[in-house]
């Protein structure tokens, strides 16, 4: 599992009068389960892109277990993300024509890391996410089943952190509830830190901590509130 420490982070985009994201300091302990909430345009997606290394910031430090990914080259960030971060997104980014298992294994195959053990883990993960037909083509699956495949893919390389961006937003209520429960249960079982961006209040309430963004700033943090109350 990975811890996250952010210091003096500012993300600005051309044409905007104020930063899209500004965080003076934020720490997330290894093994934490954290909900990221806030209105549209509050900075949540920028936060995900920055901490996952999908975008680079030129101002601030983003340390995963002490490694500052803000200082990495793009190729090094990509390698770090592949080895340490499992991503589950609202859009599943699965490939039609490939089976559930082939989609789970695809990133490992592209990285030349699809060993026998990894393939066996792929099979096992599909069972753990509730899918009994690894050879089933993606295009024949429901959206809830597709998200289960995406969760299996995210867990394949035993990531230290799982980052999920609105993982239940495109699902119906029943499927969303099942996928949310599955994501949390698997993160606990795997020992992964979990960061979930979500408007799903039921899912957010199951997590240990809630951080709310507004206009690119942290407007509320349940951990800080708990510390003040103590």
Predicted regions and their residues:
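Catalytic Walker B motif of ABC-type/P-loop ATPase nucleotide-binding domains
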Residues: 162-165
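Conserved ABC ATPase signature
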Residues: 137-147
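Conserved ABC transporter NBD signature motif
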Residues: 60-68
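Conserved ABC nucleotide-binding domain
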Residues: 125-139
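Helix-to-loop junction immediately C-terminal to a conserved catalytic motif
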Residues: 52
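Conserved catalytic motifs of ABC-family nucleotide-binding domains
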Residues: 158
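A short, flexible loop at the N-terminus of ABC-type nucleotide-binding domains that lies
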Residues: 1-3, 11-24, 74
């Amino acid at each position: 599992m990975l811890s996250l420490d952010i210091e003096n982070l500012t993300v600005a985009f051309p044409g905007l009068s104020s930063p899209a994201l500004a965080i003076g300091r934020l720490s997330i302990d290894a093994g934490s389960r954290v909900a990221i909430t806030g209105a549209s345009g509050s900075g949540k997606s920028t936060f995900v892109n920055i901490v996952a290394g999908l975008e680079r910031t030129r101002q601030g430090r983003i340390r995963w277990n002490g490694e500052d990914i803000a200082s990495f080259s793009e190729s090094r960030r990509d390698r770090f993300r592949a080895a340490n971060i499992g991503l589950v997104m609202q859009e599943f980014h699965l490939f039609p024509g490939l089976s559930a298992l082939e989609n789970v294994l695809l990133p490992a195959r592209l990285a030349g890391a699809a060993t026998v053990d990894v393939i066996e883990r792929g099979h096992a993960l599909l069972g753990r996410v509730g899918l009994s037909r690894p050879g089933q083509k993606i295009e024949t699956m429901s959206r809830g089943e597709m998200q289960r495949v995406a969760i299996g893919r995210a867990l394949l390389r035993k990531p230290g952190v799982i980052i999920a961006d609105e993982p239940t937003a495109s699902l119906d209520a029943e499927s969303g509830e099942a996928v949310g429960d599955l994501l949390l249960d698997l993160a606990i079982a795997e020992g992964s830190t979990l960061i979930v961006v979500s408007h799903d209040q039921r899912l957010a309430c199951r997590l240990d901590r809630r951080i709310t963004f507004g206009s690119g700033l942290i407007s509320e943090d349940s951990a800080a509130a708990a510390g003040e109350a103590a």
